[in-house]
Amino acid sequence: MDDAGEIHALGGSLRREASSARSGDAAVFFSRSSSRDEDDEEALRWAALEKLPTYDRARTAVLAMPEGELREVNVQRLGPQERHALLQRLAWVGDDHARFLSKFKDRVDRVGIELPTIEVRYENLNVEAEAYVGSRGLPTILNTYANVLEGLANTLHITPNRKQKISILHNVSGIIKPHRMTLLLGPPGAGKTTLLLALAGNVPSGLKVSGQITYNGHTMDEFEPRRSAAYVSQHDLHMGELTVRETVNFSAKCQGIGHRYDLLMELSRREKEENIKPDPEVDIYLKAAATGEQKAEVVTNHILKVLGLDICADTIVGNNMLRGISGGQKKRVTTAEMIVTPGRALFMDEISTGLDSSTTYNIVDSIRQTIHIVGGTAVIALLQPAPETYELFDDIILLSDGQVVYNGPREHVLEFFESVGFKCPERKGVADFLQEVTSRKDQRQYWMHGDETYRYVPVKEFAEAFQSFHVGQAIRSELAIPFDKSRSHPAALKTSKYGASMKELLKANIDREILLMKRNSFVYIFKATQLTLMTFIAMTVFIRTNMHHDSITNGGIYMGALFFGILMIMFNGLAEVGLTIAKLPVFFKQRDLLFYPAWTYSLPSWIIKTPLSLLNVTIWVFITYYVIGFDPNVERLFRQFLLLLVMNETSSGLFRFIAGFARHQVVASTMGSFCILIFMLLGGFILSRENVKKWWIWGYWISPLMYAQNAISVNEFLGHSWNKTIPGFREPLGKLVLESRGVFPEAKWYWIGVGALLGYVLLFNILYTICLTFLNPFDSNQPTISEETLKIKQANLTGDVIEASSRGRITTNTNTADDSNDEAISNHATVNSSPGKKGMVLPFVPLSITFEDIRYSVDMPEVIKAQGVTESRLELLKGISGSFRPGVLTALMGVSGAGKTTLMDVLAGRKTSGYIEGNITISGYPKKQETFARVSGYCEQNDIHSPNVTVYESLAFSAWLRLPAEIDSATRKMFIDEVMELVELSPLKDSLVGLPGVSGLSTEQRKRLTIAVELVANPSIIFMDEPTSGLDARAAAIVMRAIRNTVDTGRTVVCTIHQPSIDIFESFDELFLMKRGGEEIYVGPVGQHSCELIRYFESIEGVSKIKHGYNPSTWMLEVTSTVQEQITGVNFSEIYKNSELYRRNKSMIKELSSPPDGSSDLSFPTEYSQTFITQCLACLWKQSLSYWRNPPYTAVKYFYTIVIALLFGTMFWGVGRKRSNQQDLFNAMGSMYASVLFMGVQNSSSVQPVVSVERTVFYRERAAHMYSPLPYALGQVAIELPYILVQSLIYGVLVYAMIGFEWTAAKFFWYLFFMYFTLSYYTFYGMMSVGLTPSYNVASVVSTAFYAIWNLFSGFIIPRTRIPIWWRWYYWVCPVAWTLYGLVTSQFGDVTDTFDNGVRISDFVESYFGYHRDFLWVVAVMVVSFAVLFAFLFGLSIKIFNFQKR
């Protein structure tokens, strides 16, 4: 057998290798049994089929067509009608999964085929990380530079390594057996993810691993573990533009789904020998899944059915800015993507996040059926498994603080803990008990010896006790006897690295790249439109009626036109940076899981986009060539076309390489600007070859722009139009123009240039492939930890007990290091079981909210319209009514897609699109969003926070802006401390928040922060969207304790919630239950032990009674599911609306919809809690912290500035002192032009992703009415000013001195002045472009056009005096033109020295450029004005536009 697919009932893939001959179940999971009687015709066809040779029999099947006809078909060559009939017939496979698996197993057993199995052993496994301890680990600018220098010194063995070792897994051992389901449990930071990664052979490179892991006795270097096992990550990384079906289908193609040929041949051969007739539906499924073009589609359809994804199969996955499937559906896509792999062992990390308990149960049950029937191996980590889900598992692994506390059969786990003095209470879920019993804070409540004094039992004692327990002894005895390798099935372990042929992998990537191009077509259409606009501008600026072939000066203008064309084509590739980096996280995941080699990914990204290059170059060349007046020769036209085409491919390859090397948007933008700078400076146009310093001449020879400039210039100036002489010269004019610009005047340089550029195309794409092959993601998670937490971890390893200290501080990256903060939390002052009202002492007004007949609809999606639906709108909420009251905790529940989050968004006023109908009142008064936002809080499902501030700073910022202005800072600080105590965040107060899934806080810590951010606002009504999603049982209990405490203060709290445990569910007072389609089916009290809820549903005919000890929430979701409605013929919505409960609720709504006597409507004297000045100060404070701790932006910017300054200084060394001729002046001006262009573009492009990330946080904070848009914009603008000042000083001092401009105070400070405000307006322009566009990628593309236009009209490529009169107006609105005006005039506008020809420099500046010295102060005002204008437009765009669609 070759598949994890079997393992999950989802499909396998038997390789066509000799070792696979005996394998067998791969197709297993996708077929449904049919008990239909065979008629005579079918019997005759089968008789004929059995006479065929094995080879033909494996490809031929009997297919029932929709009209009833039985047709003998070759599954490798199906027509469209037959293909459709086959897929329709097999659509039922997922509905009877266990029966299908049993039929398959019976079939292989009958012919004696043995299915392969894997036993995984791990012995003395240790995993360590290295981390900086304390504040040194924070990513500040100074720490970043210090770390780089220290790392270099460590490499050279100059200084010792100051990082401390952190133990993640400590000496763990165990056995994971086939045919058994293993549940992995443990508190946050226990090391669960690291253990799963280690067992799957996918440990991050930064970790040190020792010990041994074997599969069937084979060490990991004897086979390919990443194909023999499948690892399902807890992070949902997908390409948002693809649909669910396309995402899973791509994985199926890459992982070898459909390669079941060997199994099929062996089955057919043995069945023919023994005259066995297989089940016809199992037979056709196996054949369809093993051969033919539909094989991956068959497998994909089955997986989608089993995981309940068939209802959203054709919906795009979506991302932060692209609306797609729900979070729970996305989690299932992550599972589906991996369970089609050929691995026989499954390691699944937190696959239930965002799923309701019934969905989790169904998925785990499907996996269990596969494991038990076909013999797979599975370890699944779950956060809050319901008791019925827990019962599906055979074995338990309990980890705590990197040590195995228990590993063995589920039925003995409670026996073990009772042997050490701890007992699980009767109504406590065993999984919840196991999560909490090793925790210092929660352990005491489970102590069973009331007559003995309790003492805390550390993890080490549990681990040692387990070694003495009979289960631990049995494991140790079994590990002492090595696994007999001869028992390992030859098909169990994979030795080939990839699951499909290179041709198939390349085709899969090509198909996906074409799909992505279609979905991102807006970007490419926009680029083409933008290029067309630039073409129009260029041909009207360099129009032939104004340009002549009669002088060297005019030749220089033509040279500028050619140079501008090359620049436009080169800048056109800049958008590749953003598009490439956006896809890298998914690529790295798929590369590490061996979906495909890097070259099959990089090649399509190059080849498939070549037609776009053809289109872009065609637009440019064929529109501009004759209008500008280039040499009218068709051959030279096509030569220019060929050259620019190759140049476009070079540019795209260069920027893809930069993106692949940098792997970070800001760093890549900086590197891209740097490369453009080097290539342009040394390309021969800005600085001619004769003027390039000897120490930089090598750069001239390696610049792609040099070869392009030489080739395109030779092609033009050796043409007929320039083959004329002018007075005073014997050589042709074209050759004179070439020589004046330092270009080689020989025809061969055209082909030299084309050849060199083709070489660069290959080189850059090869380098890009190499980067993708060998480099890891940019954020290679470097964990940091506080000294106190490190001591606690070390104490847990040694069994010591340390005293609690006043405050713990942790900064941890759970994704890599799994640092445990559990004990650090427990060391802090204990939170009582009901500290509730403490910490909620600030006064507030209790408020109720009622809503009646709420309807919400959206425009009908095009995908659904394409299926024949004629309605213009899709209704998501259908007349919902209810009320939420003070002091009452309400659970908003329903299966995925029921509309829970939609209803909450509507009530909270968070919807930005769609159509809302119905009435909402707040304590009897109509809801007004402006005032409602002041008294309400909203905890979003996605925990959105500024990544570069600490936990305490996040809370301080929220409290500062949302609490009333009359509350003084001391009271506010006290309140923040109390809220942190309430949600147990005090030990994490100095932890950096970080980015989800990348750095900083763990999922559950981030969730508690989200709640705390709302609590510090002291709201009357709080909405919480899945506050326990992604948390383990203990963390969920902490969160629920905080929520319960909040409710007990008299607040109104509503929570959507998935898969709650019995404890959590019964902590709610009322339940608002919805069914799929947006209708309520129960709105009422939960009752003691859920008695009210159970009584209501059990009174409905056809509803099964709840079993003793069963989770009421799980039972409720099961009995009200759509499937049960169909089975029982019950419409729960109609029953509810005809019930007494509904009438009581309507009466309550009516009562609460009338204002109480003596009450008044909500009103506030001001729109926001704080004054405008306070809002500005708060926003500036947060931005200052964010910038200081964002070294990829700030530290890289300064490093880039220093490097660029040194490059400019050495390239233009001393040109400021040379004034012999006009070329000397042009060289000096070139240094100014290049510095303005490149430093400015770098500032603009690097600030865009920073603003884009913060804008997502801004949307949440603005919706909460924390501040108005203007203070946010002012804070973002103001924080840049000091950083730009430092940048200007660094650059200005270095460059001014090295270039050798005149050392007078006035000229020096004028130079600094213009550089400072130029960098400012470029930076503010970058911010503005993000504010005006929906995403960073669009902003990047739009900006490229403006950079090009500013470049053209700057006055360097073509001076103002030569710009056509109809375009001269734009010169005056081009900010770069004003900058160059100011720089040149301030340095040379008053110089009375003369050139060699006797012309005074100041006169030449005035006559040639049109620069007047007495206009300098006006120029200065204009440059400042542009900075102010762009900053103002950024603020205006932030205020007006909201691109977040909800």
From Swiss-Prot:
* Name of the molecule in the record: ABC transporter G family member 53
Residues that hold ATP 1 according to the record = G186, P187, P188, G189, A190, G191, K192, T193
Provide the species name.
Answer: Oryza sativa subsp. japonica (Rice)
Domain ABC transmembrane type-2: from-to ranges: 504-717, 1174-1388
What is the protein's known function? May be a general defense protein.
Would you indicate the residue range of the signal peptide?
A: none
Similarity remark? Belongs to the ABC transporter superfamily. ABCG family. PDR (TC 3.A.1.205) subfamily.
Q: Where does ATP 2 bind?
A: G894, V895, S896, G897, A898, G899, K900, T901
Q: Which cell locations does it reside in?
A: Membrane
Q: Name one Pfam family in it.
A: ABC_tran
